[in-house]
Amino acid sequence: MTNFRLNVLAYSVMLGLTASVAYAEPTNQPTNQPTNQPTNQPTNQPTNQPTNQPTNQNSNASEQLEQINVSGSTENTDTKAPPKIAETVKTAKTLEREQADNIKDIVTYETGVTVVEAGRLAQSGFAIRGVDENRVAINIDGLRQAETLSTQGFKELFEGYGNFNNTRNGAEIETLKEVNITKGADSIKNGSGSLGGSVIYKTKDARDYLINKDYYVSYKKGYATENNQSFNTLTLAGRYKKFDVLVVTTSRNGHELENYGYKNYNDKIQGKKREKADPYKIEQDSTLLKLSFNPTENHRFTFGADLYEHRSRGQDLSYTLKYQKTDPNLAEVDSRHTNDKTKRRNISFSYENFSQTPFWDTLKITYSDQRIKTRARTDEYCDAGVRHCEGTDNPTGLKVTDGKITRRDGSELQFEKKNNTAHSNGETYDFKKFIDTDKKVIEDKLTLKNPNDTWYDCSIFNCENNAKIKVFEGNYSYGYDGKWKEVDLEIKTLNGKKFAKIKDPTNKIKSILPSSPGYLERLWQERDLDTNTQQLNLDLTKDFKTWHIEHNLQYGGSYNTAMKRMVNRAGNDASDVQWWATPTLGYNFYDQPYTCATAYSWNANLCPRVDPEFSYLLPIKTTGKSVYLFDNLVITDYLSFDLGYRYDNIHYQPKYKRGITPKLPDDIVKGLFIPLPKNSNSKPDEVKKNVQQNIDYIAKQNKKYKAHSYSFVSTIDPTSFLRLQLKYSKGFRTPTSDEMYFTFKHPDFTILPNADLKPEIAKTKEIAFTLHNDDWGFISTSLFKTNYKNFIDLIFKGEKDFPLVSGGSSLPFSLYQNINRDNASLKGIEINSKVFLGKMAKFMDGFNLSYKYTYQKGRMNGNIPMNAIQPRTMVYGLGYDHPNHKFGFDFYTTHVASKNPEDTYDIYAKDKKQTDTSIKWRSKSYTILDLIGYVQPIKNLTIRAGVYNLTNRKYITWDSARSIRSFGTSNVIEQSTGLGINRFYAPGRNYKMSVQFEF
């Protein structure tokens, strides 16, 4: 086992807990009976008893309902019970106590589990046991959630430029009844994707609230200073005769997470050196609705709607392609605006049967229709205001007054007179030097346009009654010296609107207008990743005995279809149009109006453009079929086994309809599978034909995978205070379509496809020793090892010369490809303990101590580090609860060790010809303190508050540090100096507070 070090305090806590438990007085009831609940049961099981009886049922039913509710309101079913091996359960009560507002808060005080950071797109799933994102399964009410485009090549090419919302969607905390976190291979529960572990969300139900009452009302309001987030949650539950209903609606409004020193950094600095977090306005809305009908106590029908939307709008001021002004007084050109969205909608119907038959005690059939859209939209335009944007710059202040062009105060235009240049027909002026109303001369800020290029909008200018306009007449056809001249206007009606132009076409006549275009050009891109899933589940349970062995059998199956597709849109248009902007395209020599197709110059205002939809991947339909069987066998009071088996059949089908499916860019598929004919690069028809042939070829490449998963857990209780648990399980993840087919060709970064990828396999072996006592608590130590086989990873394959399209010399291209690595291995140790101090002394009644510790180390292909492994982490806890729950607090101390350079790996080191393959920017060790408390002054009111990072420690987490990219335009810093890294630091001291009314 890899060596590890615990500090003195950790040893003290461990020894104290061990001694306390070992010498605790035995209770009257035996404590060594294994739980009848399996440790890795499937996620969508129905309850074992009907809990929908109205309140006028007999007292036994009421007691039964209350018992079920209590078991669901504490962590790990009972906080004094020993934990199940490699499993943590967070209930709604626990999440409320910890003031969790997002998925990151769920695992704040869990060791060995962190959240993947994704820059402006917040979080993207979890990291467990050395793997992250798609290798950690996430589901809500039995439904798999959206996966990222997981190929590392796609991430580096596109995610690093902020063009895709390539993240895993989250969940609204206020709708959750329970979060089950499992560490290690876990495909019995979730099928494909459960390599490092799983996170399973279960939403609330009306039955959770309607205990001995027919209604429940709750209103909660909270605020957090770390991101100025305020939230409101309204929960309504009611029962009427055979119907019950639950509604939970939550809205959240805040802004970006305030990094350490947020208020002290210069807000004007832009680009990768920016130290202050980029500004975003973040909103989240969620509604959970469940309506149930109970014709009898043994039958229950439920309609559910789970609606979730997360929106983030702001500016990427750290964007590296941002135009950098050399003079702060210059007008702004543009900046990058973001408008990202994650939207999930799940409509479900379920039927539950509680009639005991020879085949089941409970039966549940569920149909779900889930639609998830993750969108990243970027708009590049200037929003600095009319007087400060280059496109609408008007420093002279010209405006239209009573249909004529005037100065900013409505007076006539004035220019600097030329000395000794008076003519009989008027004064000569230098039209390059404009005199403002304050007598200051503004030079070279106006444009003199040819008559044929100038149109006046008659809705703004005076075009009636033989109207005239004052213009510039030059001494020559060039230069700025000239005199005023009043000329006639010619009226034209184009597309139903009246416009005027100067009648005299001489090249000495010029119109006088501001030099800017008079509008703000906007370049926009909108990228959608859609995952639509329809799923049918059948889940059954049956308790029975064979000889003297008790069985808790769970079995069933599922059938699902999922369509995953990418849609990209892009275009140009204009906004903030000013009076001097060209109002019409005009007409040609034959007196025919120009159109956007025939005009000789492009105008973003008059000819907004929307490009045809395109995609980098073909839509993929996935059909999944699975059956599972799980049995919890209780042999004796001292021995039990959990046996699980699952079979999955997964079928990938590319779906392409010519002319309907968004087109793939030619360069992505050109010559991919079917080579281009020789000397065809210069023949567009040949290239187009080859592109279509390759698309058709990909669309016919169906892939089928079959997988067998299993799990074995043994629970042995040799004494009343000692428990030994052994676990061996297998998980898998099938390659995604983008991992197999994605390709990209560029001299700096060329991705080669690999259609021969095998499924990833994970096998976990774990042993846990637990000392426990019903009154004292528990201490559990586990050793684990996970072996990954066929681990998919992106590697640098070297350089290859490709001939240029134009012929002649060749150019070296850096080649990358996804491959199955021979193996990857991870091992580690975890400690989880909680001791209740009331047995030591009466005055300590209600106090508890807790300690968690995780250390893990892993390598791929022998000696390549796994970057997703978290540094050594420990969490100390001191808690108190009043006997009547009038008030309480929790004090947490979290210590995280430094990320050692030898435990990191830069995949671009070889490409950059570096001998040091470690990642340059890593997290240092840190210790943070959190204090959380609650008080219940009256029965219906609960006030919660917390102080986080109590000592105002400056630190960066490893997940934030590893999100820094070595190239790209987003999430980058100046690599040579480290300027910009403060943007990634965690918040300093911050506070949370919430108030909840319940009736």
UniProtKB/Swiss-Prot annotation:
Changing T108K: In strain: E1a. Keywords: Cell outer membrane, Membrane, Receptor, Repeat, Signal, TonB box, Transmembrane, Transmembrane beta strand, Transport. Residues 212-999 form the TBDR beta-barrel domain. The keyword Signal applies. CDD domains: ligand_gated_channel. It is found in: Cell outer membrane. This protein is subject to phase-variable expression associated with alteration in the length of the CCAA repeat region. This mechanism is called slipped-strand mispairing. Addition or loss of CCAA repeat units would change the reading frame and result in introduction of stop codons downstream of the repeat region. This may be a mechanism of regulation and a way to avoid the immunological response of the host. This is Hemoglobin and hemoglobin-haptoglobin-binding protein B. It comes from Haemophilus influenzae.
